[in-house]
Structures are given as C-alpha cells and as structure tokens.
Amino acid sequence: MTGTKTGTSAGTYEAVVVGGGTAGLSAALVLGRARRRTLVVDEGAPRNAPAAHMQGYLTRDGMPPAEFLAEGRREVEGYGVEIVRGRAVDVVRDGAGEFDVTLGSGDTVHARRLIVTTGLADELPSVPGVAERFGRDVLHCPYCHGWEVRDEAFGVLAATPMSVHQALMVGQWSNDVTLFLHTVAEDELADEDLRRLAAAGVAVVPGEVAELVVAGDRLTGVRLADGTTHDRSVLFVAPRPVPRTGLLERLGAELRETPFGSYPVVDPTGLTSVPGVWAAGNAAGFAEQVVNAASGGYRAAATLNGELLFADLDAAIVRGQG
C-alpha cells in the first residue's frame, strides 16, 4: 500500500478492517488465520493512548498499550494481513453489495466485507489541568486503574450522568472520596443518589471547579472558583464519549440513541443493519474495555468468514445450474 499512487485503486480484499486498535487487530488475526485477504486501515489513535499501562487483560496485565498493539500488528502481519497507516475517509456500497473504501491518501480499496472498529473519542471537561493529566492521575476507569491508586485521596468531577455512579464505585478502592459537583446543582441530584452517597461516606462538595493543582508533576489538589482548595491526589472523571460513526452513517446504518452517544444497532456478532458490515469494540458500544473489544473483533471476524464461505458456495451452485 505504501507504494500506491494517490487517487488509484489499491486492490481488492475479502475483508477491510477500519481501525487498528484491539478490536480491529483481533478481527484481522482471525481473518488472517482463515486465509482471507485482509487489509487493516489504522489511523494510529487508540483510545487508551494516554495510559501508561493497561490492566485486567489476563497475561497482559500492566502491559503498555503501545507495546500491546505493536505485538498485535506483528502477529497479524505474520498471517499475511496488510496494515496501512491512514484514515478511511469515505465508503460506498456498490450494486453487488460490496464496498469501495477511500483512504485519506486518495487511494481506493475494494472490500467484499467490512468491519468497522473506529472506536470513540473521549471529550473531557474544559477544566485546566484535566486534559494534561488524563491517563496519569486524572483517570476514568477504576477497573483499569483503581488498584494502582488504591487508598489515595480520590476526587470525582461531576461531568456526565455517570458521575454519581462513578463516585460510588471508586469507593471500592479508597475510603477517602469527594464528589465535586462542578456545574451540577446539589438539588439536581436525586434523593436516592444523595442517600447512597451518604451511606458510602462520599463527601459532596458544591461549587464550580476552576483548576487542578499540580506540584512536582503530581496532582495535589482541586481548586474551586471561590478559591478554596481540596487536597486530592487522584481525580476520576467520566468523559463524554463521542462515537466515531461517520463511515457507518454514510452507509445508512441504523443507530440507537443512548445516554452516552449514538451507536449502531448490531446483532450479537456485531452485524449492523447494513448487510456485509460489522462493528466491534467501542464502535459498537460505550463500555467496551480491551478484553471486550478483542472478543467483539473475534466474533465479527468469525461470522464474516462463515458468511463469505456460504456466499461463495451459493454463487458456485448458481453458476453450476446455469
């Protein structure tokens, strides 16, 4: 692919996987081992890039995400899968029910089937220091990072409908938890939520958060707009997820609205409402951690392989009858 000219047709593949994260590489591994001619289009922007380590994946607990993906690329290339660094900017379904995928380079590749694993982007609150510390001591997932920061002084920044749930959940890893309401008024919280927060021993602090306090390249506190500072060494925040559904929307895939964005309607294998198109990982749903994404990519690829097998057999039968 690296030698193709801009604007040219760069080949036909049995499957094109758009997205080179965990779900995409897992799908590509299955397809490569099934001897399917497969291309992975990898934009190189995995969701967990800010994190130094990933956790909760059996035998890979604590592995740096970049190292994990590099090993994944090495494995899939060993089965003849091609990987091109770039972005898929458009896709069109042709009259035969197959797909022409246009890359940012201007090249077009043809895919008999398509797996979309473009994931989502995390939109962080616009509080000074949050984006800069994200993945370090500003965290979003206690299952991913809670053990490493256990028993520290936790803060939770109210930013999404998940924030109260998050404040209750992180108490599993620390007895010192403060929920900063930020732009949420205390009377906006449900009575049941307030009772649960009190039962869990979570302190609730009203007032807008102005900035994070950092000293020696470590989070040391949370400063409110009124100037008061609360000592905290870890801040949990639930980013607003922004699904990358552009390609699926161009194909006319049916979407479902959730409190965390719009995602494609999929069956248990990841098949969307568009025949021949699967979605996996965070392209298919909000709460897909690395291990779930790998599983989703595997299921989509195995189903795609079987669907191609029977499509080719049925076509051979029709040709034989003619």
Which sequence ranges carry the predicted segments?
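Residue-level detector of alpha-helix initiation sites
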Residues: 21-22, 122, 161-162, 284-285
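FAD-site-proximal beta/loop scaffold in flavoenzymes
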Residues: 3, 132-148, 241-291, 299
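N-terminal glycine-rich dinucleotide-binding loop that anchors FAD/FMN and/or NAD(P) in oxidoreductases
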Residues: 33, 37, 43-45, 52-79, ...
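A conserved FAD-binding loop/helix module that cradles the flavin
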Residues: 27-29, 164-168, 280-322
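Glycine-rich dinucleotide-binding loop and its adjacent helix/turn
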Residues: 123-168
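Beta1-alpha1 glycine-rich phosphate/pyrophosphate-binding loop at the start
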Residues: 13-67, 153, 162-187
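A Rossmann-like FAD-binding core segment of flavoenzymes
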Residues: 70-103, 109-111, 174-262, 309-322
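Extreme N-terminal leader/targeting segments of oxidoreductases
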Residues: 1-13, 70, 79
